[in-house]
C-alpha cells in the first residue's frame, strides 16, 4: 500500500495507448462478446504516465454494486466538510432489510456506525448497508451531485438497492461508462477529491473486499496487489472496478462491464477473469 500512496498526488494527463499494445486485449474482448452474445466495455488507465486504453469506453453500462465505492467516497467527503459524522449510529430495523444483506440482517435491533456500514457494503456488498450510506449522503441525488462536482458528467445514480440493479437496455438510470468510472476512481484515490487519510481508508475497504476472489484476484500476477469492487444485476449485468499495482508497477485502474447477455454468472465471471488476464499480460510482458 505504501507504493500506492506514493502516487496519491499524481494525476497525469490522459495519453491514449498505442493500438498495437492492447491489440490482443481487444481481440480477446471481441471474442468473448461474440461467444456470450454480450455487450462489453473495458477501460485501462496507467496512473504513472496517463496512458489510457478502452473498448466501448464511452458506452453506458449498469453501475450495479460498483456504485458503492462512490457512495462511500461521498460519505468520506461529507465527513471532511463537517456535514456528517462517520461515527454516528443508525438503528437497524427489520423493515429496512433488502435482499443480500449478510452483515446487516444479523444486527436487526442494533445500531451500526456509518463507518462500519461502509466497511460492510464495501467488503461484502451488503445492500442494506449501502442504503444506510445513501440515506446519510443525500440519497442517489446527493451521490450524482457529488459526481458532477468532481467533474464526472456521465455516472449517475437514480435509485437505491435493490432497484438500481435492474439493468434494462437503454435505461440511463444508474449507469456509468468504463471511461468515466476509471477517471472518477483516479480522482478518489490519487487526486484531490479526498484527503490522503480518506484515500487510505477507501483503498483499505477495497483491498479487504471478500467477494471478488474468483474474479481479477484469481489471475493477479505474483507480487501484485489489488483493491476492487464488483457488481451484478439484471439482463446479464456483471462488473468490476479495480486498482492493481506492484513494487515495480505504478497503479493501474481497470474497469470491466458486461451487459445484455443470457450467459450464466459463472460464464460472466470467467469473462472478467479472461479479460483481466489479458490486460495483466500487457504489463507483465513488458517486464520480462
UniProtKB/Swiss-Prot annotation:
> Reaction catalysed?
a beta-lactam + H2O = a substituted beta-amino acid
First-tier enzyme category under EC? hydrolase
Name its GO BP terms in alphabetical order: beta-lactam antibiotic catabolic process; response to antibiotic
Among SUPFAM superfamilies, the record links this protein to: beta-lactamase/transpeptidase-like
Domain of life from the UniProt record: Bacteria
A Pfam family assignment:
Beta-lactamase2
Give the enzyme's EC designation: 3.5.2.6
Q: Catalytic residues? A: 65
Binding annotation for substrate: 229-231
Record's keyword terms, sorted = Antibiotic resistance, Disulfide bond, Hydrolase, Signal, Transposable element
- Any GO molecular function: beta-lactamase activity
What is the annotated role of this protein in its UniProt record?
Hydrolyzes both carbenicillin and oxacillin.
Q: Family, per the entry?
A: Belongs to the class-A beta-lactamase family.
> What else is on record for this protein?
The class A beta-lactamase family has a specific amino-acid numbering system, sometimes called Ambler or ABL numbering and often misspelt as Amber. A multiple sequence alignment was used to derive a consensus sequence and then the consensus was numbered taking into account insertions and deletions. This allows use of identical numbers, e.g. for active site residues, despite differences in protein length. UniProt always uses natural numbering of residues, hence there appear to be differences in numbering between this entry and some papers.
This protein is called Beta-lactamase PSE-4
Source organism per UniProt: Pseudomonas aeruginosa
Q: Which lineage ranks, top first, belong to the organism behind this chain? A: Bacteria, Pseudomonadati, Pseudomonadota, Gammaproteobacteria, Pseudomonadales
